[in-house]
Swiss-Prot record:
Chief subcellular location: membrane
Alphabetized UniProt keyword annotations: Cell membrane, Membrane, Peptide transport, Plasmid, Protein transport, Transmembrane, Transmembrane helix, Transport
Gene: oppC
Record domain ABC transmembrane type-1: where: 88-280
Database matches in InterPro entries: BP-dependent_transpt_permease, MetI-like, MetI-like_sf
Binding partners and assembly: The complex is composed of two ATP-binding proteins (OppD and OppF), two transmembrane proteins (OppB and OppC) and a solute-binding protein (OppA).
Protein name per Swiss-Prot or TrEMBL: Oligopeptide transport system permease protein OppC
UniProt KW Transferase keyword: no
Subcellular location: Cell membrane
One GO BP: transmembrane transport
Protein function: Part of the ABC transporter complex OppABCDF involved in the uptake of oligopeptides. Probably responsible for the translocation of the substrate across the membrane.
Membrane topology designation: Multi-pass membrane protein
Keyword Transport in record: yes
Amino acid sequence: MTEKKHKNSLSLVHSIKEELKKDKLAMISTIFLVAVFLIVYIYSMFLKQSNYVDVNIMDQYLAPLTTGHLLGTDNGGRDIIMMLMISARNSFNIAFAVTLITLVVGNILGVITGYFGGRFDLIFMRFTDFVMILPSMMIIIVFVTIIPRFNSWSLIGIISIFSWIGTTRLIRARTMTEVNRDYVQASKTSGTSDFKIMFREIWPNLSTLVIAEATLVFAGNIGLETGLSFLGFGLPAGTPSLGTMINEATNPETMTDKPWTWVPATVVILIVVLAIIFIGNALRRVADQRQATR
């Protein structure tokens, strides 16, 4: 069994490599994303909180290419490159955390409901239908407003309340297909426990789909966090994010006369999300190919 899983994992890695070789855009996107994450996290490790919290009025709104400030400064006299790195790190951290929770909850619930089916599955799906029709953005904003001592973990928890639904339904649908395959029926006949069948036999066969779903969920969470921060309902005051940088554009004067304060963050979000989507589409094709050949 261990040898078989090892071969499957090698086959998965090989399939992904081959797809990236064929899809040059996805390959370039992968290299770009790795470079962005390395630069953002390594750079931010050497910054102190005072670097992006302290205000220097004397350096307010310095134009790009000013000595010591390649992309200029913002309304607090803070270097745009520095703020871009810190903001990107904070936005990525929120997106990573929500994506992790989404995948864990979505995979567990999706596999369980898809495997057992029946009345439990019917009731659970009606519950997810109800959650999906709720105005999630408005509810998130209300929670952000009323929760005392709101912080980053609060935001992660609030977003995660609604984020797992789509992943759960996707994993459930694929699990229901796997349940009818011969290897599952053979395991049931041999007396293998339901837990082992679900998470040691069925779930590994969903790995490509899970990876593809993770990339797209991550891109969506970056967009959601950015949107909330742009509206003023994201990360708490004093914690910069890409959304708070773009919020500078809400001032008409700043939008037209000082575009360097918000354009860099907009470009980063656009390129990063597009790169993640290109990678996710390539991984989705790998998942579909592996499913078709089984």
